[in-house]
């Protein structure tokens, strides 16, 4: 959480999906469904959201039709993120999975697990080197590990993206290499706000 997932989804859709959608009504509806994103410590996403609600059909490389739908979810809580506590107590939220209210952190974890296990075809693990906001790198390590280990435990294919203000810098390179060594996966650094089409 607070790694740039919503920003990535918005940029991905803006650059790779919306320009290739032929139906204008579908394109406008998809724009309306894009997630909000902002910097800082405050959690923006509150529940899993399919973007777009119905998979968009686009053509890759000119003529290969594919259906694309991303899922924006809260992710596991990062230490230092805010927005899940009101007063001195954790916010209680209603979810589709329980008949009673549950703590926000539990809802985020349940929603994230459901996305990983039940909905995702390919996972995108979004993490950061700590340069994109107010949280430090160490605050992302536990939720990053939990996410990667969960995907590995069920054999779900995934990629790791390291969001960084300096994706070609030494710190981003070092963090990517640490992730690769620790989990045996490829980690790619990038500045997700700056994603551009070709």
Give the label of every model feature segment.
Residues 1-99, 117:
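Conserved G1/Walker A P-loop phosphate-binding module
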Residues 59-64, 115-119, 150-154, 180-181:
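Conserved catalytic network of the ASCE P-loop NTPase/AAA+ motor domain
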Residues 80-83, 134-139, 169-173:
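Conserved ATPase-coupling elements of RecA-like P-loop NTPase cores
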Residues 81-132, 151:
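Inter-motif core of Ras-like GTPase G domains
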Residues 110-111, 132-155:
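Amphipathic helical hotspot of TIR/SEFIR-family domains
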Residues 146-159, 164-198:
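Canonical P-loop GTPase G-domain recognition
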